[in-house]
Structure formats: structure tokens, C-alpha cells
């Protein structure tokens, strides 16, 4: 059995400050703003909340795992702390908890740590260098992937800030008996969508001008204003070219990556940038890998159980985000929804239920960020359907 105590949000959901739809990752504790506690059937309890200074809460987060009279501090005194998984089976009989931490609001990257939830928890794996981490049973086939990006490798690449890059190279990882495997090539459809989206934004005239440049696009101290404007426009094309190359390279298609580089990069600079791309990747998450996932030729979906068949999923994080540009209060009417929550505790689908006939986009965007302790059947984490109602507050 898993018992849960959640502060700030249960089924009546607090309306949090507006966040852009492009920002799809939320964290449980930000500057000590919320608390969560849950216990697993093995007797291990997770607690996340504001760090205490004497009797007062601080604007920092702390997370612990405790069992019996013992306690293990996962992190303390940090601005960001998230519980990404709790009770999730990465392999049969091996339930884990996973935490995402950041030591600074301004730092590029986060750290992801998985802990066993056996009677005496222990650290299993640490992954560093991602701008986010999110575990999901993406195909509902029972295999859990960890989605992240290689922010640490490309931050400052060619003088670029992460905020300038729309599509930071993505990794899809899998932990198999504690071996960290690259499963990105199994999700080429995702990378193809990135490539299609980036190519659609490329201006052919600017691409031609960029290919006629030196590729470095470095301004001199006495560059006139018009030249600076021109270089800035070419810089956008340069980023787009890198995004296409990265998408092919990180999805296991090196040949296509270099073909795209030849099509989109100045000929005289291709050897330099190719070597630099490979060096940057080598010092990122790639350096932490134990191999490449072989994958399955044919993926078979696992059953999605209804609530009477399982111990139901329970909420870790269920915040509601108002529509962008929302000025007045939202309708206070209760919204009934049916969710499919995968075996990693992430929402795979949301649709109206009961008296609710249509879902506004903000409900779907909000649901995509929710996290749950998954449902359990025979002590295994499984995908399930659940009905719930949300009531956005003014």
C-alpha cells in the first residue's frame, strides 16, 4: 500500500502563475513553495518541502527518504527539487524513486538521481547535464524512458546561449539493470518532427547568405550597425542548421547529420564545425552512457487497467495553468476528466468525462505537466485510467 499526504493541492487545484505553453516542465518544490509526502509498501517514506531553519520554513527545498528510525537526505538548501518517479518499476521487482535537483536558479543544468525503494534505499544512478528530466512509458509498452536534453554539452557552443536554441539536442535514455542506455533511435518520429519544424522556419535567402559566410559570424569592434543586424539574422540560420544536424546525430543517423551539414553550412567551415559538434557531444551525457539500447522490432502495448482492477494512481503534482493572456478569473465550474496515467506516473491522454463535453487547451496543457504515483497491480506499476474533477480557483 502507498499512503500519500499532499500540501497545497489535492483534487481542488490551486491556480498557479501563468506559464508559457512552451515551458512544459514543472517541479514539485521551487524556492520552498510546496510540500509532499508519501510512503511505499516497503516502509520507505519520501518527504519533499521547504527546508526548516529552526522552526521556520526557508525559501529553499529539502528532500529525504526515511525508513524505520533512519533518514537519508537526498538534497537540502537548493532552489529546485522534483520527485519525478515514486514506486516505478524500471525492471521486475525493482521499484525506484527519482529526483531532479538544481543547485541554482541560474545554472544551466539539473541532476537526476534514482534510488531503490527496497527496505534500505540506496543510490542507483546519477545523471548530470540535462536541462530537464522526465521519465515516461512513452509507448505504453511497459518500458520506461527518461527524456532529457544535452544542455550541458551545448551551453556556450559557438558563443550561443541556451535561450537562443529552440531545439536543444534531446536524449531518450533507458535504465536497464542500472546500465544507462541511449534509446533515442527508437523515437525517430520525435526527431523527425523537430527537423520538419526547424526546416519550415529556414529563410532560403538567409541560408544562401549564411553559406557564403565564414560560418563563425564574429563581428569586429568597428562593425557598422547594418553589419551587426546582418550577422544577427545569419546567426538565427546558423542555429537552425545546428538544430537539424543535432536532431539527426542524436537519433543515431550520423550519415544524414553530415549530409545536412553539407547542405546548410559554409563549405570552408564544415570540417571545423563537425569536429566541434562531436567534441561537444562527447563531453555531455554521451560520456555517461553504458551503451545503446537494442530496442524491440515490434512494440506491444501493455494493458491499461481501470480503477477497480488496481490500486489507483495518486497525485504528486497537479497544478492548473491559466490560458496565456488570461485577464479575469476562470470559470469556477468543476471540470470532469478521464486520464490515462502510464506506469511511470505521467499523463498520456486526457479527455472530457461526465458532464464535461469539451476541454479547453489550458486543461490539456496543464495535464501534460502532472505527475502521479502510478497505479499498482500485483505490486507492479502499471498504466491505468482514472476519472477526476478539477476546480480552478479564482
Predicted segments — roles?
Residues 61-90, 95-108:
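Active-site acidic/histidine clusters and adjacent loop/turn architecture
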Residues 62-77, 113-128, 172-182:
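Surface-exposed loop/turn elements that mediate protein-protein interactions on large endomembrane-trafficking
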Residues 56-59, 105-110, 161-168:
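Short, solvent-exposed loop/turn segments at conserved positions within beta-propeller repeat blades
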Residues 21-45, 49-53, 148-294:
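Acidic, small-residue rich beta-repeat scaffolds with periodic aromatic anchors
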Residues 88-99, 137-147, 154, 379:
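Acidic, glycine-anchored loop motifs typical of Ca2+
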Residues 7-18:
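Bacterial N-terminal signal peptides
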Residues 80-87, 129-137:
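Repeated scaffold domains used in trafficking and secretory/extracellular systems
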Residues 287-394:
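Charge-biased low-complexity segments
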Amino acid at each position: 500500500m502507498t499512503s500519500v499526504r499532499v500540501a497545497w493541492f489535492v483534487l481542488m487545484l490551486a491556480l498557479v502563475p501563468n506559464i508559457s505553453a512552451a515551458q512544459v516542465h514543472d517541479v514539485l518544490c521551487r524556492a520552498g513553495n510546496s510540500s509532499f509526502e508519501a510512503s511505499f509498501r516497503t516502509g520507505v517514506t519520501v518527504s519533499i518541502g521547504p527546508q526548516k531553519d529552526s522552526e521556520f520554513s526557508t525559501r529553499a527545498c529539502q528532500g529525504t527518504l526515511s525508513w524505520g528510525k533512519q533518514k537519508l537526505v537526498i538534497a537540502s538548501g537548493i532552489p529546485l527539487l522534483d520527485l519525478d518517479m515514486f514506486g516505478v518499476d524500471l525492471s521486475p521487482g525493482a521499484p525506484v524513486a527519482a529526483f531532479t535537483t538544481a543547485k541554482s536558479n541560474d545554472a544551466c543544468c539539473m541532476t537526476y538521481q534514482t534510488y531503490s525503494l527496497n527496505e534500505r534505499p540506496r543510490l542507483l544512478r546519477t545523471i548530470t547535464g540535462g536541462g530537464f528530466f522526465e521519465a515516461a512509458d512513452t509507448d505504453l509498452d511497459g518500458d520506461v524512458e527518461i527524456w532529457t536534453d544535452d544542455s550541458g554539452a551545448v551551453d556556450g557552443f559557438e558563443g550561443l546561449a541556451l535561450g537562443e536554441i529552440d531545439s536543444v539536442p534531446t536524449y531518450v535514455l533507458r535504465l536497464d539493470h542500472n546500465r544507462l542506455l541511449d534509446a533515442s533511435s527508437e523515437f525517430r518520429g520525435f526527431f523527425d518532427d523537430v527537423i520538419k519544424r526547424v526546416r519550415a522556419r529556414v529563410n532560403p535567402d538567409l541560408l544562401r547568405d549564411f553559406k557564403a559566410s565564414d560560418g563563425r559570424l564574429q563581428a569586429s569592434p568597428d562593425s557598422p550597425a547594418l553589419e551587426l543586424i546582418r550577422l544577427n539574422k545569419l546567426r538565427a540560420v546558423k542555429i537552425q542548421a545546428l538544430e537539424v544536424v543535432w536532431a539527426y546525430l542524436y537519433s543515431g543517423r550520423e550519415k544524414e547529420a553530415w549530409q545536412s551539414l553539407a547542405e546548410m553550412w559554409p563549405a570552408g567551415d564544415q570540417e571545423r564545425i563537425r569536429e566541434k559538434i562531436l567534441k561537444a557531444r562527447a563531453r555531455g551525457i554521451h560520456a555517461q552512457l553504458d551503451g545503446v539500447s537494442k530496442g524491440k522490432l515490434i512494440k506491444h502495448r501493455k494493458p491499461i487497467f481501470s480503477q477497480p482492477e488496481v490500486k489507483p494512481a495518486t497525485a504528486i503534482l497537479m497544478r492548473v495553468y491559466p490560458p496565456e493572456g488570461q485577464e479575469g478569473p476562470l470559470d469556477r465550474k468543476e471540470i470532469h476528466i478521464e486520464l490515462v496515467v502510464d506506469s511511470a506516473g505521467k499523463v498520456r491522454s486526457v479527455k472530457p468525462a461526465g458532464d464535461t463535453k469539451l476541454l479547453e487547451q489550458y486543461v490539456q496543457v496543464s495535464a501534460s505537466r502532472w505527475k502521479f504515483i502510478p497505479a499498482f497491480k500485483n505490486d507492479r506499476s502499471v498504466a491505468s485510467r482514472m476519472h477526476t474533477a478539477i476546480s480552478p480557483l479564482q
